[in-house]
Swiss-Prot record:
Protein name as catalogued: CBY1-interacting BAR domain-containing protein 1
Subunit organization: Homodimer (via BAR-like domain). Heterodimer with FAM92B (via BAR-like domains). Interacts (via BAR-like domain) with CBY1; this interaction is required for targeting FAM92A to centriole and cilium basal body. Interacts (via BAR-like domain) with CBY3; both proteins form a ninefold symmetric structure at the flagellar base; are recruited to the annulus in a mutually dependent manner and regulate annulus positionning.
Family: Belongs to the CIBAR family.
Residue ranges, compositional bias (Acidic residues): 271-288
One Pfam family named in its UniProt record: FAM92
Keywords on record: Cell projection, Cilium, Cilium biogenesis/degradation, Coiled coil, Cytoplasm, Cytoskeleton, Differentiation, Flagellum, Membrane, Mitochondrion, Mitochondrion inner membrane, Nucleus, Spermatogenesis, Transit peptide
Gene designation per UniProt: CIBAR1
Region forming the signal peptide: none
Regions annotated as coiled coil: 107-176
Cellular component terms (Gene Ontology): centriole; ciliary basal body; ciliary base; ciliary transition zone; cilium; cytoplasm; mitochondrial inner membrane; nucleus
Membrane topology: Peripheral membrane protein
Region named Disordered: 266-288
Top-level taxon in the UniProt lineage: Eukaryota
Species of provenance: Bos taurus (Bovine)
Gene3D superfamilies: Arfaptin homology (AH) domain/BAR domain
Length: 288
């Protein structure tokens, strides 16, 4: 009867040991992966800082509107990296550290398991010794009584450590579930806060880029490229960019203007001829 009880408790202990081993394995993996996730996020922040610097350097070489738009974008993007830094710090404190703490917690539970196993092994050893004593010296009541006393002590110790282990593992399981809920809730909250801020910042950055006046910057570029004859070239470009209707109207205006000028020239020429004829008549009359 006692040996069957020992076997049942051994099976229970193995189950508790498997539970602790399972937590040790998977919490260790989760801790390593979350830590790598945080490191990757920190490296992304560092690369973003380099990108901000390069954008500012490039912006200083560009035309006014493009320069201002890029600098505003860089400012917003730099602001986002401040939020990313906060994300890294929070993930480290709220996710990685609690998982890392389970290394110590699991070690303590293994110590409890070890103490329980030691007590049960002692109990099993005393039971085996009592059975041998009864077989070898069935009539020696003193030796048998002494072996029974040792077994009773070992059983009491094993029962006490087993009860303590059961309570400890029960609390461990309860705390594990609570911690998992807390850790993953913190992870989701931190990520949501960051991405919410990121959406605001990216919206502002997008608006800054869209505000860049392409035409104004293009005129500034052309003026710097053709400082002397920029106006005439610009007129040519504008003329070439007119619609067919505008070009037709312009041609008609030019044609009408030419016809008016031709009529005026002909009229002036006719007037001059008439004046010359009048002068010739006057001279003839005087001679007569």
């Amino acid at each position: 009867m006692l040996r069957r009880s020992l076997e049942n408790r051994d099976a229970q202990t193995r189950q508790l040991q498997d539970a602790v081993t399972n937590v040790e394995k998977h919490f260790g993996e989760l801790c390593q992966i979350f830590a790598a996730y945080v490191r990757k996020t920190a490296r992304l922040r560092d690369k973003a800082d380099l990108l901000v610097n390069e954008i500012n350097v490039y912006a200083s070489t560009e035309t006014p509107h493009l320069k201002q738009g890029l600098k505003n974008f860089a400012d917003e993007f730099a602001k986002l990296q401040d939020y990313r830094q906060a994300e890294v710090e929070r993930l480290e404190a709220k996710v990685v550290e609690p998982l890392k703490a389970y290394g110590t917690i699991v070690k303590m539970k293994r110590d409890d398991l070890k103490a329980t196993l030691t007590a049960r092994n002692r109990e099993a050893k005393q039971l085996t010794q009592l059975e041998r004593t009864r077989q070898r010296n069935p009539s020696d009541r003193h030796v048998i009584s002494q072996a029974e006393t040792e077994l009773q002590r070992a059983t009491m110790d094993a029962t006490r450590t087993t009860r303590h282990l059961e309570e400890t593992i029960d609390n461990f399981e309860k705390q594990k579930i609570k911690d998992i809920k807390t850790i993953f809730s913190e992870f989701i909250t931190i990520e949501m806060l960051f991405h919410g801020k990121a959406l605001e910042v990216y919206t502002a950055a997008y608006q800054n880029i869209q505000k860049i006046d392409e035409e104004e910057d293009l005129e500034v570029f052309r003026h710097s490229l053709y400082p002397q004859d920029y106006s005439s070239r610009l007129d040519i470009v504008r003329a070439n960019s007119k619609s067919p209707l505008q070009r037709s109207l312009s041609a008609k205006c030019v044609s009408g203007t030419g016809q008016v000028l031709t009529c005026r020239l002909r009229k002036d020429h006719q007037t001059e001829d008439d004046d010359e004829e009048d002068e010739d008549l006057d001279v003839t009359e005087e001679e007569n």
